[in-house]
């Protein structure tokens, strides 16, 4: 959309880094060096010193597996929660949007990201434990309010891979195969087997669970999006490109475009 965007990857798994086409194992300064800058005895590395351009036009502050080793040191920093916020101060006026990617596990990187953020988007998958993650996050939000005085209210939830493993929300050739549809008009399909009947019952039960989970999530977030499972997402990741550049008209790409439109209304 022509906006200048920075992605700050604070997850040691470095999926955002790899997803934007940068090899996480490549040499060079990364977020480990930025976080360690606040520790006595380590060299000063500003966030601007590690930012790299990516093929999509998005700027990236890359992560590295070494970032795992930085977390124990953060507890000894003068203000552990504000290390990232202080680092962002040098570059935030250069960008329209800065996205902070945090790990899925609890710790200083998540708290640093939440403290630095103006808005919070919670990403969930459609698995059975999605609501457990929401409950845990609510506890973190309350702790940050009590300890730091900052109230955090998530603006949006994104449920990804919606319908994975079932026909719901899944892009398949079967849905668009005109020959198959015509064939079934003139030929009665065979009676389903016992296994097919059982599979259909299990699929229905899973869809009911998904809808019940989604209803609970909608109660807790002002805005909720479900991103359908799409092979295009994984192809985009392998090529190091955002879905908006690789397959914007895919089922997932259309939803992410709607998400981007809403996010742009926040400022």
Regions found by a protein language model. Name each.
Residues 1-267:
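P-loop NTP-binding core
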